[in-house]
């Protein structure tokens, strides 16, 4: 049995969970999320907790046990607290701003890069160099943050580019020159 999967998921007070077979819907103050879980697990609600159990002891079912428990736990936490991912723009001329809902990033190209947020994700910019991606769906927030970072990933010589807050970049020494 999965060590992660056997832990029950507590349901906070302001969160409502609806189970319909393998379809799980979670509604809370930060929004509403729904997901259909893969075959091999069963989901049940016991008092104020959600319990995920494997339907058999086959390898696939045991593999999916911990995964499904984590997916449901992330949904519950997302609609109650939400998720945020922060990025930093480093380098001369690197700026970001929000126009309407769009994020406009100037990262040293000849043109600014515009990004539309998907449903349920919002962008916020502090002092033109710090971008915050927030939303209820952990997967969507992480994907959008990765797309922003991919515009100009940090380079190893001077560290310029877009990086996650607190991310360490392995630095390389430049050319040593001829002696």
UniProtKB/Swiss-Prot annotation:
A GO molecular-function descriptor: structural constituent of ribosome
Keywords: Ribonucleoprotein, Ribosomal protein, RNA-binding, rRNA-binding
Pfam family, one: Ribosomal_L6
Any one Gene Ontology BP term: cytoplasmic translation
SUPFAM superfamilies referenced in this protein's UniProt entry, alphabetically: Ribosomal protein L6 (SSF56053)
One cellular component (GO) term of this entry: cytosolic large ribosomal subunit
Quaternary organization: Part of the 50S ribosomal subunit.
Family per record: Belongs to the universal ribosomal protein uL6 family.
UniProt function note: This protein binds to the 23S rRNA, and is important in its secondary structure. It is located near the subunit interface in the base of the L7/L12 stalk, and near the tRNA binding site of the peptidyltransferase center.
PANTHER family in the cross-refs: 60S/50S RIBOSOMAL PROTEIN L6/L9 (PTHR11655), LARGE RIBOSOMAL SUBUNIT PROTEIN UL6M (PTHR11655:SF14)
NCBIfam families named in the record: L6_bact
Name of the protein this chain belongs to: Large ribosomal subunit protein uL6
Organism ancestry: Bacteria, Bacillati, Cyanobacteriota, Cyanophyceae, Synechococcales
GN (gene name): rplF
């Amino acid at each position: 049995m999965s060590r992660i999967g056997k832990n029950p998921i507590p349901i906070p007070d302001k969160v409502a969970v609806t189970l319909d077979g393998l379809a799980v819907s979670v509604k809370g103050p930060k929004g509403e999320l729904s997901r259909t879980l893969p075959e091999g697990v069963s989901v049940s609600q016991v008092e104020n907790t959600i319990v995920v159990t494997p339907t058999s002891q086959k390898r696939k079912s045991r593999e999916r046990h911990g995964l499904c428990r984590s997916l449901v736990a992330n949904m519950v936490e997302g609609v109650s607290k939400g998720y945020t991912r922060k990025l930093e723009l480093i380098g001369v001329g690197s700026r970001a701003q929000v126009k309407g809902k769009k994020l406009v990033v100037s990262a040293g190209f000849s043109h600014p890069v515009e990004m539309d947020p998907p449903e349920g994700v919002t962008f916020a910019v502090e002092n033109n160099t710090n971008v915050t991606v927030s939303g209820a769906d952990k997967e969507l927030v992480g994907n959008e943050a990765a797309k922003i970072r991919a515009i100009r990933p940090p380079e190893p010589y001077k560290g310029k580019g877009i990086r996650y807050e607190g991310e360490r970049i392995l630095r390389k020494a430049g050319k040593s020159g001829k002696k």
